[in-house]
Amino acid sequence: MTYRGTRKSPCCSPPPRCGPPLPSGPAGSALGPPSSGAEEEMTKEQVYLREFQPADQEFARRIFYEGIKERILSSAFRGLKYQPLLQSVYAVIIIMCFVVTKSLLVTCCMPLFLLGMRYYYSRKIILNHLECALRTDMSDIEQYYMKQPGSCFWVAVLEGKVVGIVAARGNEEDNVVELRRMSVDSNYRGKGIAKALGRKVLEFAMLNHYSSIVLGTTAVKIAAHKLYESLGFKHVGVVEHHIVPGMTHSLLERLFFQLRYHRYCLQLREE
């Protein structure tokens, strides 16, 4: 069977295919294909993974948008836990507030003000970042992923509804593929959908003979990092004060918004 998703030819030329079906497994296998020769794979929750189709565009954009938007709160509040320097700065500000105002009421309100400013800047920057993504690769998934050599985009479908997305973007020079845009509808999490999507990218990388898979994330939630580790990824570094589109680098922005960018890698074979 000819595989249409190699790195030397567009992976999704009509009819769209980014890879062959998984090898046949025992009947009723949780991750095995539903029938011989079928494209989709099925999880135990009856979730099918298939290639992106043009009709999925708005559903995929919605899932991506809502998934990133969730990071507003986590970046503003939970992220402070991993920013000891800012914690110290805020403590000094609160102390100075009391020294200057001599007001216990004003001083007690200062932490709420600081958290409010963190939320404001987190929302402002993340929404700007989202708009940038929606104007670039997520504006035309078909063109950016399905028609590019070594790239592909998949959706997870449950009962006819798109509930999850993931993309793979190949880099032939480094012989690596990047796992991108993974997100699952918040109403359908905890069903193993994200792990199945991640495995789809692993399968794609192996079939295309890439040496490794890389990904980067600013996610604060521990569950996201545990997911990558469960797929075999190794944490290879973190970039403090990560810059995203939409940032102005102002003093107030640096004071109330910081991102940590985690890099992961899964080595498939030695070069």
From Swiss-Prot:
UniProt feature, compositional bias: Pro residues: 12-24
Annotated membrane topology: Single-pass membrane protein
Keyword Ribonucleoprotein among UniProt keywords: no
GO cellular component: endoplasmic reticulum membrane; intracellular membrane-bounded organelle; mitochondrial membrane; mitochondrion
Top-rank lineage group of the source organism: Eukaryota
Catalytic activity: L-aspartate + acetyl-CoA = N-acetyl-L-aspartate + CoA + H(+)
Biased composition (Low complexity): 25-37
Cellular compartment(s): Cytoplasm; Microsome membrane; Mitochondrion membrane; Endoplasmic reticulum membrane
Pfam families hit by this protein: Acetyltransf_1
Ranges for domain N-acetyltransferase: 115-258
Keyword Iron-sulfur assigned: no
Keywords per UniProt: Acyltransferase, Cytoplasm, Endoplasmic reticulum, Membrane, Microsome, Mitochondrion, Transferase, Transmembrane, Transmembrane helix
Region Disordered, annotated ranges: 1-38
GO molecular function, one term: L-aspartate N-acetyltransferase activity
PANTHER family, alphabetized: GNAT FAMILY N-ACETYLTRANSFERASE, N-ACETYLASPARTATE SYNTHETASE
UniProt similarity note: Belongs to the NAT8 family.
Functional description taken from the UniProt entry: Catalyzes the synthesis of N-acetylaspartate acid (NAA) from L-aspartate and acetyl-CoA.
Protein's name according to its UniProt entry: N-acetylaspartate synthetase
Gene, per the UniProt record: nat8l
